[in-house]
Amino acid sequence: MMDNMQCGYYNSGSPYNFPSVLGPGAAIGPGPVPLGYCKEPCPTRSLCDPSYIGACGIQPLINPFGPRRAVTTWKINYLVSNRTNQAAHTDPDLINPWGIAIFGNQLWIANGQTDTITNYDLFGNKLLGSITVRNIAQNSSYPTGIAINCTGNFATTNGTLTKSGLFLTCSEHGTVHSYNPQVDPLVSFLVLNEQLTGEIHVFRGLAVAGDVLYLADFFQSKIMVFDSNYNRLLGFPFVDGDTSDPIPISYGPTNIVNIGCYLYVVYARKDPNVPLQAITGAGFGYISIFNLDGTFVRRFTSRGVLNDPWAIIPAPVECGFPPGSLLVSNHGDGRINAFDCNGRYVGPMLNQSGLPVIIDGLRGLAPHYTDFNEIFFTAEVDENIDGLVGSICKDQVIYF
């Protein structure tokens, strides 16, 4: 059984002092999601309960009209690339990486272009051989999101041996794969194939909460929900209820992230010519918050600095971010922006020159749970031709 620190913020209270946000009386609702899902008791309603918009005490990272203040800066370390001389290590299978997870002080990366999961230590040294993620009936699966499974369910099998999957990955070909090295150290087996329905499904992100699997279907513009035996569950609406600022029909969910007792759904704008793909642009993006039963809580943030957003992680308060803040990666402009617990923009992560950190093709983010000073990332470079894994480390403090 994995402990909370290993499972991270996806399946329990966060080690980042990010408060559990389910207030008294705010039941998760009907359906198979257990009321005792949060491993830590949810406290009384806090200012960072997403259903309560209060005075979080927002403090922009840079305020030209305020007093001088200390700001933490960050530096980029390039750990692994598919190209030589681009990073400390080279791995030809690291092409078009998306999701990233940290488990057992190791990095696990889903690579879309090579249909693999690659595994490294925190310095970028490759550990296992590349893990195949492929549907035998197809030439490719194109894995995107990856999630740690802490439940003991969501089985994977090689036909002889069956175990709970350690990781689940989803793909842009509408499939889900489950991996356990005891079943096969180099194969992640197909466990769900929605292409068999005859419809097009493009899964760009996934989340596991209790014994429920949530999939962000970008093409169908919906969240699909399954139980731990991969049976479809209905009755989870996932309808954005912000009538004052409705999400246009040209958008679809590109990722879903479980933080505390809530699900954050990230929306990207579809390419009108190729609706399986997203397009980038300033203000292209929405993020909304839902209960685990799919009922709408509130809009977190809209447009503004969003530019084809994808990953969301808790921001480390130890590095000067307001309590309950979140960091959001932009694939479009390569920035990592901070938002307070009410969804108000705080500012970008900065380099030592006081300028925004920019990572070309930025996609996934994963904080190092035992070290608040480091965040790992994935990036797809040169239009899916190349890939990069790196870390962003706390650098020096500067004053504005």
UniProtKB/Swiss-Prot annotation:
InterPro entries in the record: APMV_L690 (IPR017549), WD40/YVTN_repeat-like_dom_sf (IPR015943)
Keywords linked to the UniProt accession: Virion
GO cellular component: virion component
The keyword Cytoplasm is assigned to this record: no
NCBIfam families in UniProt: PEPCTERM_chp_1
Family: Belongs to the mimivirus R640 family.
The name this protein goes by in its record: Uncharacterized protein R648
Organism whose genome encodes this protein: Acanthamoeba polyphaga mimivirus (APMV)
